[in-house]
Amino acid sequence: MRIDPTTSGSGVSTLEKKKPGRVVQIIGPVLDVAFPPGKMPNIYNALVVQGRDSVGQPINVACEVQQLLGNNRVRAVAMSATDGLTRGMEVIDTGAPISVPVGGATLGRIFNVLGEPVDNLGPVDTSTTSPIHRSAPAFIQLDTKLSIFETGIKVVDLLAPYRRGGKIGLFGGAGVGKTVLIMELINNIAKAHGGVSVFGGVGERTREGNDLYMEMKESGVINEENIAESKVALVYGQMNEPPGARMRVGLTALTMAEYFRDVNEQDVLLFIDNIFRFVQAGSEVSALLGRMPSAVGYQPTLSTEMGSLQERITSTKEGSITSIQAVYVPADDLTDPAPATTFAHLDATTVLSRGLDAKGIYPAVDPLDSTSTMLQPRIVGEEHYETAQRVKQTLQRYKELQDIIAILGLDELSEEDRLLVARARKIERFLSQPFFVAEVFTGSPGKYVGLAETIRGFQLILSGELDGLPEQAFYLVGNIDEATAKAMNLEMESNLKK
């Protein structure tokens, strides 16, 4: 966002040098500003505080108007640190909301909440900007057709399919593979759908944001040689930023994604990590603005704020935004207002399991805990639905038998249960898959598996046709033909050893 008030561009009006406002009160990241009569800014307008601090360094702080207080005063929330600000400093109304660069030039770059690049790669090569505040698409613009968003990841497509233009909650602790799964989805949407991705880092660790950027460069998701060939734009408002920046960075990322959907007519993946931090920042701002807190100390406008973000994430007749949102659950309490409000908007949940991660099953998506509203016969078809249900039943029965196996051993099971356990172990291994973005670590080429191939593979395992193959043959392969080929190779190797 350009904050020189005499310059046009970046969605900020060309303004004459007019009588500015003055800072009259500073409470942490919240400022009260007095304007001359008749010159009051609108709600959500961007203000710029200009001046010099006590050692003569220039100050340029962007703020957003949140309340009109009367007596020609407004209350605004700062988007960067307010260190060095003093009462009486000049404040200029830009006449428009915060506006950020959009379009292909944003790919491969890292931005802050104001749309300023923070990756030391120079200015963004675009004059196209969009305001971060806008209405959700009108009902008549929406594409209400229910369609599956194929990811090429077997466990997701079969058991908890994503809806095109839907919202997915990604649940998982530290180190279970959220980042790798996110990068694989970014890679696959670019290859299979010709789509792009936008990653919004909302209130998470700066180190994690840096690690993600480095891993994306290493795996080719961000192309260092030709930045225009990159598949993702990154927008960061990390946990050291003021609450205003953390509250608005999700909208900045969403605005960039909306341009790809509405103007470029592409399918877009929008990642938000972490949606809880968006609510948390809103809660901090709400208290500073003097609003009465609601349940558990959250802001009274919690549902409205969440709705204004989530309702813009949808499919239109031009394209779609499919959003994957990491959800932190405070104290593992699912009834906490923040996660409870988030759940109301989700179409699917992808739960990552530390137990599967310990077994070496990657991706470590829990097939029994992950859910989707799309897994209905009228949407996915009878064949897909039946196969998914039989896979879940087999895995559920295996889970129930594990205590007996641990105490008494496999030999104490009935013949029928032994067969079921063998098939369940094959299914568990067949749900694993080599990822394109993990090639540099594993040395094995990544695999994109179409939905029809996935269904065929699991049907063959369930039917018993592959009972004679060793379970190791199903581990980290793509489709079922690769599993049978791997079984033959394993047999040849064992024969050679003999």
UniProtKB/Swiss-Prot annotation:
One GO term describing the cellular component: mitochondrion
Subunit structure: F-type ATPases have 2 components, CF(1) - the catalytic core - and CF(0) - the membrane proton channel. CF(1) has five subunits: alpha(3), beta(3), gamma(1), delta(1), epsilon(1). CF(0) has four main subunits: a(1), b(1), b'(1) and c(9-12).
Keyword Coiled coil: no
PANTHER family: ATP SYNTHASE (PTHR15184), ATP SYNTHASE SUBUNIT BETA, MITOCHONDRIAL (PTHR15184:SF71)
Name of this protein: ATP synthase subunit beta, chloroplastic
InterPro entries: AAA+_ATPase, ATP-synt_VA_C, ATP_synth_F1_bsu, ATPase_a/bsu_AS, ATPase_alpha/beta_chains, ATPase_F1/V1/A1_a/bsu_N, ATPase_F1/V1/A1_a/bsu_N_sf, ATPase_F1/V1/A1_a/bsu_nucl-bd
SMART domains: AAA
Gene Ontology biological process: proton motive force-driven mitochondrial ATP synthesis
GO molecular function: ATP binding; ATP hydrolysis activity; proton-transporting ATP synthase activity, rotational mechanism
Organism in which the protein naturally occurs: Nicotiana sp. (Tobacco)
Bilayer topology annotation: Peripheral membrane protein
Compartments where found: Plastid, Chloroplast thylakoid membrane
